[in-house]
Amino acid sequence: MIRLLAFLVGIFFAGLLLLSFFVNLTGFITDPPAPTAETAGFHQEPKELHLASNGPLGKYDRQQVQRGFQVYKEVCSACHSLKLVAFRDLRQLGYTDAEVKAIANQWATEVPSINPETGEPASRKALPADHFPSPYPNETAARAGNNNALPPDLSLMTKAREGGAPYVYSLLTGYAKQEGYRNEEGKELLKEFPDAVTPKGLHFNPYFANLNIAMPPPLVADGQVSYADGTKSTVDQNAKDVAAFLVWTAEPKLETRHGVGLVVLIFLLIATVLAYMSYTAIWAEAKRQVAPVGPLDPDNMEKRAEARVDAGIAGGPEPGAGH
């Protein structure tokens, strides 16, 4: 009785779910949701970005990543932190110990500390062992200085956002004037969606998910960053370089991982060749040397032939032949 009751209850809920599904499906077909600016082709996919670190055998372009660090230092660090990266990690980019120490000591934001005499909160110059400090003391201060938007930490940005480095590059170079903006089909945004006007305090960017982003354009003009290596500084170059730097912050062991992967592939290839050679040299020969056993054994076939002769059916077909 209990099983029957449980079965009926299950049937009831299953039927209820099916009914709800068909009702919603019918409503979706008869009254589909209205298109939005994001779904009508005004949101753009990230542009292509070719970096030296791309691909299964990619390696970092140390000069480009150093330029990207310079862009982060002079532009991005005013709002964004790198909590998972230590100053001493910069040695992987080719900086010497003395240069790393100088970078840490001259960093604009000091590291939170405690006054050893009074026990009160204090700050000190950064050391190579310290992680990059946040430019804000807390989340409330960060939101207060950015129109209530919290600037995200950039340590893992290229892994946390779909599109990775191309998304970062496209976002930084994608700010545009909303008035007169058209999609690839030639449709004008504000004519198709008059209510899509960018709210006050936000900035139009077709590469952002909802087209409006709180971050103002960080790269506004060519020459904004003067590269130490003499590379021509343009907005496009700045965006590419800082995207390459953020790939490194997210995957500092990328080159090691690629190297280990290559070694493993070579090992598997050699092991496969050796296994095939062992098969052809040992097992295939051993297989040919195994004597047949059973009805096809030559001795058994000879005995059957003699038995047919003794039975007077010599020359007749083998038993079962033709079946």
What are the roles of these predicted feature ranges?
Residues 258-283:
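Selective detector of the "anchor" transmembrane alpha-helix that sits immediately C-terminal
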Residues 207-251:
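Extended, hydrophilic extramembrane loops/domains of integral membrane proteins
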Residues 55, 64, 85-86, 92-93, ...:
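Acidic/histidine-rich catalytic neighborhood
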Residues 111-213:
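Membrane-proximal low-complexity regions enriched in glycine and acidic/polar residues
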Residues 288-323:
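Cytoplasmic C-terminal tails of single-pass
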Residues 72-83, 242, 246:
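The canonical Cys-X-X-Cys-His
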Residues 1-59, 275-293, 297, 301:
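Post-cleavage N-terminal segment of exported redox proteins
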Residues 44-70, 81-100, 230, 250-258:
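Electrostatic cytochrome c docking/interface patches
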